[in-house]
Regions:
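Conserved beta-loop-beta element that borders a ligand/cofactor-binding pocket
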Residues: 138-164
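Short-chain dehydrogenase/reductase
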Residues: 115-138, 168-172, 195-196, 227, ...
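NAD(P)H-binding glycine-rich loop region in Rossmannoid oxidoreductase-like domains
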Residues: 6, 12, 39-95, 101, ...
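Active-site "gating" loop of Rossmann-like NAD(P)-dependent oxidoreductase/epimerase domains
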Residues: 104-128, 143-148, 165
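N-terminal Rossmann NAD(P)H-binding glycine-rich loop of SDR-like oxidoreductase domains
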Residues: 4-28
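Mid/C-terminal beta-alpha module of Rossmann-like enzyme folds, strongest
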Residues: 208-267, 278, 283-284, 300, ...
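Conserved loop-to-helix N-cap of the C-terminal "lid" that shapes the substrate pocket in Rossmann-like
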Residues: 154, 190-203, 219, 227-231, ...
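Substrate-positioning beta->alpha
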Residues: 168-174, 187-210, 217-218
């Protein structure tokens, strides 16, 4: 593929950092626009990247920073509500050949009526406002594509991780509890299947979509084909951490009654089996397949955290919540 110019809005998160690295590896010229405050910069960006400081949610700030430049690709990781994408349509119409919106696979019908999930699965998540907002953004962008030819491609990631991210609510606190023998909360019975994707696998497919006219006007999800159960995900992390945890299975509805925000993320996403058909992305990016097994990713996660004590942060709020939930279970299990 020819060298492309790309503007990445965000660029310092779990997914976007990997995408920037992959784009530079392929020889593309990448500009990253953000406020310069991204915490994920601990996985630093390549020196070849041009950095521009601006507030992505302030149209005038972006306009001043870019000065009317044209990019082959604009990829935003910072659009969450329809107002965000309407602002971007006004900013980038006529200034890019492809605008890529990062949506979310959590916007799909929840729970799904059929598995595997395909791109034609309805978008309907009554449990999680975040997901409904992403679906509304998609509707706004596709209307602009139909009405004015705005060159949008929609990408729906599912659970994507990197070495800095323990794939549980509560993060490292869960691993710490595993190692010290405190009860480890597993939502539900742990048997639901969950697709989990390594950040480098996602990035290779994502950058493979750049500059592809066939991808315009389409939504596509990018996920691994590996879908272990939550029990297996917990066990894989525990094995990598050298721990033999005590698990306590807690119904997601019970969790929601104790902590509505945690419960919404479960009932609206992680409590349901999610397996994806990746036929479309493989057709659009024929040389792509996810190659990193979660067993390898789990070892990366533990190694990264163990390399520096400052990374092994225990959140007292999550720790206390897990203790509360564990204490409830004799009542519910009796």
């Amino acid at each position: 593929m020819a060298q492309l110019t790309a503007l990445v809005i965000g660029g310092t998160g779990v997914i976007s950092t990997a995408c920037v690295h992959e784009a530079v590896r392929r020889g593309h010229r990448v500009t990253v626009l953000n406020r310069g405050t991204g915490a994920h910069g601990r996985l630093s960006l390549p020196p070849e990247v041009e950095m521009i400081q601006a507030d992505a949610h302030d149209a005038e700030s972006v306009r001043r920073a870019l000065g009317g430049r044209h990019f082959d690709v604009v990829a935003t990781f910072m659009a969450f509500v329809p107002e965000d994408v309407r602002r971007d349509i006004a900013l980038f119409a006529g200034h890019t050949a492809q605008y890529i919106f990062i949506s979310s696979a959590s916007a799909y019908q929840t729970p799904p009526a059929h598995l595997p999930v395909t791109e034609s699965t309805p978008l309907h998540n009554p449990f999680w406002q975040y997901s409904r907002n992403k679906a509304a953004c998609e509707e706004t962008l596709l209307a602009a594509y139909r009405e004015s030819g705005f060159p949008v491609t929609i990408v729906r990631p599912s659970h994507t991780y990197d070495p800095t991210m323990v794939p549980f609510d509560g993060g490292w606190t869960v691993v710490d509890r595993m190692r010290r023998g405190a009860p480890v909360i597993v939502p539900g019975d742990g048997a639901s299947l969950w697709t989990i994707t390594h950040h480098t696998d996602f990035a290779r497919a994502f950058v493979g979509l750049w500059g592809q006219p066939r991808a315009l006007g389409h939504a596509v999800h990018i996920t691994s084909d590996e879908a272990p159960s939550w029990n297996e995900i917990f066990a894989t992390i525990a094995a990598a951490a050298g721990a033999e945890p005590r698990y306590v299975h807690v119904p997601s509805q019970v969790i929601a009654g104790v902590d509505p925000e945690f419960g919404a993320a479960l009932l609206g996403d992680k409590a349901n089996s999610m397996i994806f058909d990746n036929t479309l992305v493989k057709r659009l990016v024929p040389d792509w397949v996810a190659t990193v097994p979660f067993s390898h990713g789990a070892r990366e996660i533990i190694a990264w955290h163990d390399a520096d004590p400052s990374r092994r942060t225990v959140d007292p709020t999550w720790d206390a919540l897990f203790d509360r939930l564990a204490a409830l279970m004799p009542t519910f299990e009796s």
